Structures are given as C-alpha cells and as structure tokens.
Amino acid sequence: MSKHAVVQFGVVYALLFPGVFGFVPSPTNVSVVCHNFVNVLYWNYSNPTEQTKFAIKVEPYESPSQTVDTSQTYLDISSYSTDVEDDYLVLLTAHDGQEKSEDVSIRFTYSKDYFDENKHKYKCSLDFPAVNTSVHKDVIEVSFQHPFKLYKQEIMKEEFTYKITHDEQMVKYSCFEDEDLCNAEVHFNQSVAGQCVELKLEGVIAGIPSYTYSNVCVPQPTPETDKTGIIAALIGGATVVLFIIMGFVWLLWRKWSNIPQMPQGLWCIISKQSHTMLLSQPEPTDICPVTSQGPLNYLTEEDQSVSARDDTGADPPVVSEEGMAGEDSQGLGCSSDYDRPKFL
C-alpha cells in the first residue's frame, strides 16, 4: 500500500472514530435567546457518542464565573446570569471521554453600557407591556404599565421612551416609573370608521428594546339623537301628570263640599245649653257629672220672689186662709207639675 493511500485511510478513520486519535469536533450554530430575562443557550452537534458531554462556562464581567455540564444541546442559563446590568461571555466545549474540543464563545447583555454591535451578535429584548386601547370619536386612547412595574428590575427605574406608528405616521412619547399608567392618544381619520387599524408600539428602556402590535377596530359613528322629541315627550308627560293631580284635588273638593251643614237653630240651642251648663257646674272633679234627661224645671215669678226675700232676710207676708183656699182651688185645676210651686 502506498504512503498516500495510508494517509487518506487515516484521515477517514479519524473522522469516523474521533476518540481514537483524540479529535473531538466543536459544537456548531451556537446561539443565545435572551428575552424577558430568560436566557437559553442553543447549539448543534453532529455524531455524538454515549460519552459526549458539553461544558458551559458563564463568565460575567463583574462577578465570578460558573461552569455546568449537560448532555443536551441546550441549556437555560438564566440562573447563572441574574444581573441584568452585567455583560456575559459564554464558553461552550464538547467532551468525549478524556478528550475535548475547542471552545466556542458567544456574548450577550441587557445593559446598554456594555452592548457593542461588534462583540454582541445577539441583542436581548423584552416584551412590550400589555396594551389597552379605547376609541373616542377620532382618537384612540392607549395605556399600559411602565416596564419596571412588570419586571421589577432596578435597571428599569428610569424613563421609558416609546413611539407609536399608525398609517405611516410616527409619534414619540415617554413616561416614568412613578406614573400609574403610560398614556398616549393617537388621532385617526374618520375615513377608517368601521375598519380595524394596526398600531405598532416600539419602546426602549435601559437600552433594552421592546415592541408589539395592536389591532384596534374603529366603530361606525352613531348618529346623534334628536333631543327635541325627548323634550316634547317629557313636557307632555308632565302635563298629563299635572292634569291628573288637578282632577284628584277637584274630586276631593266636591266630596267635602257635599257634607250637610248643621241647621242654624240647632247650633244656637247647643251653644246656649253649653253656656248654661258651664255657668251652673261646680269646679271640675275627676267624676263626670250625670245630667238629667227629663224636662227642665223653670221657677215661677212667685218662686223667684220668695227666693229673693229669703236672701234679704225679710219676713214673708201673712197669707189668709181665704187666699190659701183660692190658691188651692186654682192649683187643682192644673194637671201639670210644672206650674206647682216648689218649696224647699
């Protein structure tokens, strides 16, 4: 066998059995996805063996390095890159037994102070905060939380600058972490009424970019209601209610006016009797006096004269027997006790 053939056979055999000659290929297509502070390293590797493992070394610029091994072709290195203000260099090496490949490196950072387009192949990013929209006439109102309230990272305690693009027109805005909400107004043409429009929102905070899209449907404007009819209806209703109240009052007045009045003569008798009873009654006591229901007894003129004499203390006149007899004869002719004199 010629020398040239032996060399060719050795190269082929070394490629097929790299562990025999100490040749271990390096990982390829190494990339890192750093988004929302979740950092995952990916790579490819051809013809791995049962003994193939990968060593990942994370070297922060401002803190000590850490190394971890895995047999997978990806690794979440978020727990090894928690400081979002630092710059990270990642070294990846393949191991097959005692042999190892050459290192493959990649850099990433969230910090604008460390980012260098020549050194950092990938630029870390964040999701734009959830956007709320509402339409009022010819304005779309946009609101969302400041990124610091969403991610709670000290690096984000600063101004958040963002821009909104609509219909090829871009407007810049800004807000700070102490504001409850970031608010913006986007004016649109009434010609888009009844259609949906797309808003593109792009923001940057601490040098970290974020963006999102929002579709907003603009409703058709509703015609203004003619208030003349409403006012007329209210006035008409009030008039009807007023007439009902007036009719009710009129019915009550008619009812009260039909109550019969007390005759004038009866009213005079009741008034006189009440006055007489008030004069003749003694001082009021707790026991109510009982009034007689019989006919009233009236004193004659003679009885009144006798009573008057008794009051003055004068002696009564002497009456003869003839006079007494005459009076008795006259008294026998009366059938009523009302004419008979009363003697006490």
Swiss-Prot record:
Receptor which shows binding specificity for the cytokine ifng1 (interferon gamma 1). Keywords: Cell membrane, Glycoprotein, Membrane, Receptor, Signal, Transmembrane, Transmembrane helix. Residues 23-229 are extracellular. The keyword Glycoprotein applies. This is Interferon gamma receptor 1-like. It is a single-pass type I membrane protein. It comes from Carassius auratus. Highly expressed in brain. Also detected in spleen, heart, intestine, gill and kidney. In immune cell populations, detected at low levels in monocytes, peripheral blood leukocytes, splenocytes, neutrophils and mature macrophages. InterPro entries: FN3_dom, FN3_sf, Ig-like_fold, Type-II_Cytokine-TF_Rcpt. It holds the Pfam family Tissue_fac. PANTHER family: CYTOKINE RECEPTOR FAMILY MEMBER B13-RELATED (PTHR20859:SF87), INTERFERON/INTERLEUKIN RECEPTOR (PTHR20859).
